[in-house]
Design a protein with these regions (language model features):
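Asp-based, Mg2+/Mn2+-dependent phosphohydrolase catalytic module
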Residues: 1-17, 30, 45, 124-131, ...
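A metal-dependent, Asp-based hydrolase signature
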Residues: 52-108, 124, 128-129
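Short, acidic loop-to-helix structural element flanking the phosphoryl-transfer center
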Residues: 12-14, 18, 72-77, 81, ...
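Short, contiguous strand/loop micro-motifs
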Residues: 70, 112-114, 166, 189-190
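Hydrophobic alpha-helical core bundles mediating ligand binding, dimerization, or RNAP-core interactions
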Residues: 32-43, 79-80, 101-109, 147-152
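Conserved G/P- and acidic residue-centered "switch" motifs that form tight phosphate/ATP-binding loops
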Residues: 24, 141, 198
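Active-site neighborhood of HAD-like aspartate-dependent phosphohydrolases
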Residues: 2-61
Length: 243
């Protein structure tokens, strides 16, 4: 077991650390903004006038992405349903609205091909340093498991990660069962596991699962985005192994 120091707090007897992906390890703000804008344009081409309010619902306003907004923190399924609700308000049937939403998001993502957002500064170094200890490392993301695995493969993180888990069914953050499932997959107890994430959902999920601790990271100094965190950091280098 390992002690992890973040700021003035030390988490003791840690066996595993679970990281969120978007906004935590992956600098995905620009990519997600482009996905939101492309999706809104595709839907607006079919239903004129819906584009701008839909873009705001996605969390994009004035060309800027709200890092606590829908497309930044919600699962793919939640994003599909939210977009479908806006479409349904125009008089379309629910199942048709869902289909339009799903197909538009698919088309938007495919238009960017196999593009992956870059790692945040310090992410690779941190994972390398943590992996040489006895810690087990994993990703628990609101993205799909396929997207998580693609991210791990693209950035060549397989040597450091024992788990790449996303949201594929009805469970989504902040449901603590996601965290419990991830811990079970790693073979560790939640009480010996840390969660590192950039959203309130990450913090609530881990807290309700009785995690050892919750580390909130905000690259832009917005502590309210990680309300409930035991400690808030502004860069990954602040996560250190206590020697």
């Amino acid at each position: 077991m390992v002690d992890i120091k973040c700021g003035n707090i030390t988490f003791t007897n840690i066996e595993a650390i679970l990281f969120d992906k978007n906004g935590t390890l992956e600098d995905s703000e620009t990519f997600l903004r482009h996905i939101a804008q492309k999706s809104a344009r595709i839907i607006d081409a079919q239903i004129p006038g819906i584009g701008e309010p839909l873009l705001m619902a996605f969390g994009v306003d004035g060309g800027k992405l709200d890092l606590a907004g829908l497309i930044a923190v919600a699962s793919r399924q939640e994003t599909e349903v939210a977009a479908a609700a806006y479409i349904a308000e125009t008089g379309r049937g629910w199942f048709e609205s869902l289909q339009i939403s799903r197909q538009s998001l698919d088309e938007a993502e495919k238009s960017f091909g196999n593009t992956y957002a870059p790692l945040f500064p310090g992410a690779l170094e941190l994972l390398k340093n943590l992996s040489i200890t006895e810690l087990k490392l994993g990703i628990l993301s609101a993205a799909t498991t396929e997207e998580v695995q693609g991210f791990i493969n693209h950035h060549q993180l397989n040597d450091y990660m024992q788990l790449g888990m996303g949201v594929d069914g009805n469970l989504s953050k902040p449901d603590p069962r996601l965290f419990l499932q991830a811990c079970e997959s790693l073979g560790v107890e939640p009480s010996k596991t840390l969660m590192v994430g950039d959203s309130v959902g990450d913090m609530q999920m881990a807290k309700n699962a009785k995690a050892n601790g919750c580390v909130g990271i905000t690259w832009i100094g917005r502590n309210d985005n990680v309300k409930g965190a035991d400690v808030v950091i502004n860069k990954l280098e602040e996560i250190q192994v206590e020697t």
